[in-house]
Amino acid sequence: MTVVEIKSQDQFTQLTTTNAANKLIVLYFKAQWADPCKTMSQVLEAVSEKVRQEDVRFLSIDADEHPEISDLFEIAAVPYFVFIQNGTIVKEISAADPKEFVKSLEILSNASASLANNAKGPKSTSDEESSGSSDDEEDETEEEINARLVKLVQAAPVMLFMKGSPSEPKCGFSRQLVGILREHQIRFGFFDILRDENVRQSLKKFSDWPTFPQLYINGEFQGGLDIIKESIEEDPEYFQHALQ
């Protein structure tokens, strides 16, 4: 089974409606500017070759080239996965974590557990519905978690560490900062710190900042909600200047 690259909205509509009954449709939203998508594109290709079931369909969508499709699912960050079954969204993941993607695919498609061995790669962003940290994460040393944080804060030019996801924030401060980024039309990656206690606690020390959300630009800590608001008040072009 191969991944179908979406070229038009008509093609997307056809593939998500024609002979789609009882099929698990996996939508993969990506962008050329997002480095984590490179890893997940490779993972998706590898996994799709191992899934021989006729009831799974993989569609790859460039979020920038097809905004009309991205808007339908309120895509605010990439990589982003949407699992659809019988016309209903059954799960959404914003992640560059192969283990989380494969685990979700296994559960929803009843795929063989051996699929888990076909995807390996670095972790970066979050699974909106993850239940918690893995055993590997619990055993991380301080050096290992710091190395992971360095990768995470640089996973996208603008990285937001928040409670919840852009589509479902878990606190008012996170919701406000997402709104500010969208208002200024800033592309951003995000990490749901509620899903990973190691990241949640270690990032406070890493950033020397005790609360969330936290915003990073080009790998540099910018501040929390109040600091970002103040920065914009002082410089309306704050984001443009920070991204230079």
Swiss-Prot record:
Example GO biological process: intracellular iron ion homeostasis
Record Pfam families: Glutaredoxin, Thioredoxin
Segments forming domain Glutaredoxin: 146-244
Annotated spans, Disordered: 116-143
Keywords assigned by UniProt, alphabetized: 2Fe-2S, Iron, Iron-sulfur, Metal-binding, Redox-active center
GO cellular component, one term: nucleus
Recorded GO MF terms: 2 iron, 2 sulfur cluster binding; disulfide oxidoreductase activity; glutathione transferase activity; metal ion binding; RNA polymerase II-specific DNA-binding transcription factor binding
Residues given in the record as glutathione binding sites: 163, 200, 212, 225-226
Domain of life, per lineage: Eukaryota
Acidic residues: bias regions: 127-143
Binding, [2Fe-2S] cluster: 171
Thioredoxin domain mapped to chain residues: 3-110
InterPro entries, A to Z: Glutaredoxin, GRX_PICOT-like, Monothiol_GRX-rel, Thioredoxin-like_sf, Thioredoxin_domain
Family: Belongs to the glutaredoxin family. Monothiol subfamily.
Other notes: Present with 7800 molecules/cell in log phase SD medium.
Function: Monothiol glutaredoxin involved in the biogenesis of iron-sulfur clusters. Binds one iron-sulfur cluster per dimer. The iron-sulfur cluster is bound between subunits, and is complexed by a bound glutathione and a cysteine residue from each subunit.
Quaternary structure note: Homodimer. Heterodimer with FRA2.
Protein name: Monothiol glutaredoxin-4
